[in-house]
C-alpha cells in the first residue's frame, strides 16, 4: 500500500491561486483539520460543499483545485486516523521568514476553529481538556511576532507554539473525530 503524501505548500498555493480562489494552503488545511477533528464523516464527500460555501460563495472549485484539495483531505484523514497519531501543519516552510510562518500559523489556527464551527461543535457536551485546548488555540490565534524582539528567541518560541498547536488539535480530534474502522481492528473473542 502506498503512503499518502501531503502536497507541498507551494504546490497547493499555486493550484488555489491559479483557480482564482482566495484561500491559502494554511487556511484550507486548518479548515479541513477542524472539520475532521470536529467529527466530519470520513466516508463521503461532505467536506466539499462546506469548503465551497466557506471559500467560494458555494460555487464548486475548478478541477485542479479539487484535485489538490482532495489530496490534502486524504492525507489529513490518513494522518489523523493512523495508529501513530501525527499531524504536519500545512504552513510556510522554515525557508520562509518567521513573520510569514507566524502569519501562516495564525491563519491555520483561525481556520481550524472555523472548521470546528462548520461541523457545529457543541461545547456544552465536551470535556474540560477539550475546552482548555480550544481556549489555548484561541489565544494562539491572536499571537504575533514583534520585529523588535530577539528573533532567535522568537524562533524557538514559535517552534514550541507549533508543537502545542499539534497537541491541542490531537486532543480535540481524540475526543470528537471519527476513526476509520477496518476489519483488522475488530477483536475476535
Curated annotation (Swiss-Prot):
One of its GO terms (cellular component) is cytosol. InterPro entries: YgfB-like, YgfB-like_sf. Belongs to the UPF0149 family. This is UPF0149 protein VF_2102. It comes from the Bacteria.
Amino acid at each position: 500500500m502506498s503512503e499518502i503524501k501531503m502536497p507541498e505548500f507551494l504546490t497547493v498555493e499555486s493550484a488555489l491561486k491559479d483557480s482564482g480562489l482566495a484561500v491559502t494552503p494554511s487556511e484550507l488545511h486548518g479548515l479541513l483539520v477542524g472539520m475532521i477533528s470536529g467529527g466530519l464523516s470520513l466516508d463521503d464527500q461532505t467536506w466539499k460543499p462546506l469548503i465551497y460555501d466557506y471559500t467560494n460563495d458555494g460555487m464548486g472549485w475548478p478541477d485542479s483545485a479539487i484535485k489538490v484539495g482532495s489530496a490534502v483531505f486524504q492525507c489529513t484523514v490518513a494522518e489523523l486516523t493512523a495508529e501513530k497519531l501525527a499531524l504536519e501543519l500545512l504552513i510556510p516552510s522554515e525557508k520562509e521568514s518567521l513573520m510569514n510562518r507566524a502569519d501562516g500559523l495564525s491563519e491555520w489556527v483561525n481556520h481550524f476553529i472555523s472548521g470546528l464551527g462548520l461541523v457545529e461543535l457543541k461545547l456544552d457536551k465536551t470535556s474540560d481538556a477539550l475546552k482548555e485546548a480550544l481556549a489555548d488555540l484561541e489565544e494562539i490565534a491572536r499571537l504575533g511576532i514583534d520585529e523588535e524582539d530577539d528573533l532567535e528567541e522568537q524562533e524557538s518560541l514559535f517552534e514550541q507554539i507549533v508543537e502545542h498547536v499539534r497537541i491541542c488539535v490531537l486532543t480535540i480530534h481524540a475526543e470528537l473525530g471519527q476513526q476509520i474502522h477496518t476489519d483488522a481492528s475488530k477483536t475476535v473473542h
